UniProtKB/Swiss-Prot annotation:
Keywords: Ribonucleoprotein, Ribosomal protein, RNA-binding, rRNA-binding. The gene is rpsQ. PANTHER family: 40S RIBOSOMAL PROTEIN S11 FAMILY MEMBER, SMALL RIBOSOMAL SUBUNIT PROTEIN US17M. HAMAP family: Ribosomal_uS17_B. It comes from the Bacteria. The lineage of its organism: Bacteria, Thermotogati, Thermotogota, Thermotogae, Kosmotogales. This is Small ribosomal subunit protein uS17.
Length: 101
């Protein structure tokens, strides 16, 4: 039986070597035929801690790695700029010892 492959968005990377991936699926309602969206969260193994919040990743089913972790990150499809900080913002300059008088 082939392994499931899913594509989703990383919503949390606070755990060590683990990310939470939100996978959305759409389907037609059986009675009303309206397109409905449903989402499910999966814990996935990220060996290098390389995923950030907002990244779009591909995950693949694997052997159980823990009680809730049964997927691993295969590749990062698209990196997000959501989590990046720029050091030039006024708040960061003040925290770094900023302005000379």
């Amino acid at each position: 039986m082939p392994r499931k492959k899913l594509v989703g968005t990383v919503v949390s990377n606070k755990m060590d070597k683990t990310v939470v991936v939100r996978v959305e699926r759409t389907f037609a309602h059986p009675l009303y035929k309206k397109t409905v969206k449903r989402a499910k969260k999966y814990h996935a193994h990220d060996e290098d801690n390389s995923c950030g919040i907002g990244d779009i990743v591909e995950i693949e089913e694997c052997r159980p790695l823990s009680k809730t972790k049964k997927f691993k990150v295969v590749r990062i499809v698209k990196k997000s700029v959501f989590g990046e900080e720029k050091l030039e913002t006024p708040e960061n300059v003040e925290m770094l010892g900023g302005e000379e008088k």
